[in-house]
Amino acid sequence: MKIDILTLFPEMFAPLEHSIVGKAKEKGLLDIHYHNFRDYAEKARHVDDEPYGGGQGMLLRAQPIFDTIEQIEAKKPRIILLDPAGKPFTQAYAEELALEEELIFICGHYEGYDERIKTLVTDEISLGDFVLTGGELAAMTIVDATVRLIPQVLGKESSHQDDSFSSGLLEYPQYTRPYDYRGMTVPDVLMSGHHERIRLWRLEESLRKTYLRRPDLLERYDFSEEERKLLDKIKEALG
């Protein structure tokens, strides 16, 4: 996968050189480049200006963004604008982006964008109902969530399949050594070696956690008969 990021602050992306994203680069599975679009700005390197019609703040000008993207060698990229008014980013969205060969991210600052910039983009993405100082943190989040889904990036292909949201449910509780820590013990079922009992326990705990913390996810979840019965059992036990 090739990723190009348009930003005024390339140095903010240093953390991406480490961990999973860094390993993807080392394996030759990811090629990532940062472009300071101030370098392409005309008018004394100014990238922002006052909005026509008046109003608060400054807007990102179209010219630096257009010129930066036009010099990027890309065949058919997904061009992503980070915007609080965009489509909410989800695990399913990350899975979709992980199938692409080329992604371009536009990280804004200031009050907003000249609307004409949006004629370039294929996706407008938001991390949620809040506003950040710039798009860099959002871009890093999306890149991390997406790159880890590229085949061969993680040690095992199944490593991400049990993640929260990958199945549509929150992930079940997990434990490691020691068995007893300060009086808190590992559930006996996980020590039993009985694979079917462990599977059922994990499924029930995933359903319980999702029901208690994110019931909205269950509204669009496609239940199996087994899952429906387990959820009914959970609801009855909780009263």
UniProtKB/Swiss-Prot annotation:
InterPro entries per record: Alpha/beta_knot_MTases, tRNA_m1G_MeTrfase_C_sf, tRNA_m1G_MeTrfase_TrmD, tRNA_m1G_MTases_N, tRNA_MeTrfase_TRMD/TRM10
Top-level division of the source organism's lineage: Bacteria
Keyword Glycoprotein: no
Keywords assigned: Cytoplasm, Methyltransferase, S-adenosyl-L-methionine, Transferase, tRNA processing
GO molecular function terms noted in the UniProt entry: tRNA (guanine(37)-N1)-methyltransferase activity
Reaction(s) this enzyme catalyzes, per UniProt: guanosine(37) in tRNA + S-adenosyl-L-methionine = N(1)-methylguanosine(37) in tRNA + S-adenosyl-L-homocysteine + H(+)
UniProt record similarity statement: Belongs to the RNA methyltransferase TrmD family.
Name the record gives this protein: tRNA (guanine-N(1)-)-methyltransferase
Originating organism: Streptococcus pyogenes serotype M4 (strain MGAS10750)
Encoding gene, per UniProt annotation: trmD
